[in-house]
């Protein structure tokens, strides 16, 4: 069984046991989160249910494995011949989750 869920403005195709890095969720480590925005639920050799826009009553349960930050991205601006340089770094926060159950 698989599902397509929306979290953090992005869509992910998930199956039970998958480990994902998603945009930061406000949840503690080792807690469970429910992803309610399910766009599609499919089973092997059975009919696929597509939501309009969401599948009613479908939920995906996941366990939070870790909270962290991604690698640093360096943003460097400069203007030639004008002695203007600006260096800035950014580390995007993420949540590592493991899909436990898909309820359709």
From Swiss-Prot:
It comes from the Bacteria. SUPFAM superfamilies: L21p-like. One of its GO terms (cellular component) is cytoplasm. It comes from Clostridium botulinum (strain Kyoto / Type A2). Keywords: Ribonucleoprotein, Ribosomal protein, RNA-binding, rRNA-binding. Part of the 50S ribosomal subunit. Contacts protein L20. This is Large ribosomal subunit protein bL21. Belongs to the bacterial ribosomal protein bL21 family. This protein binds to 23S rRNA in the presence of protein L20. One of its GO terms (biological process) is translation. Pfam families: Ribosomal_L21p. One of its GO terms (molecular function) is structural constituent of ribosome.
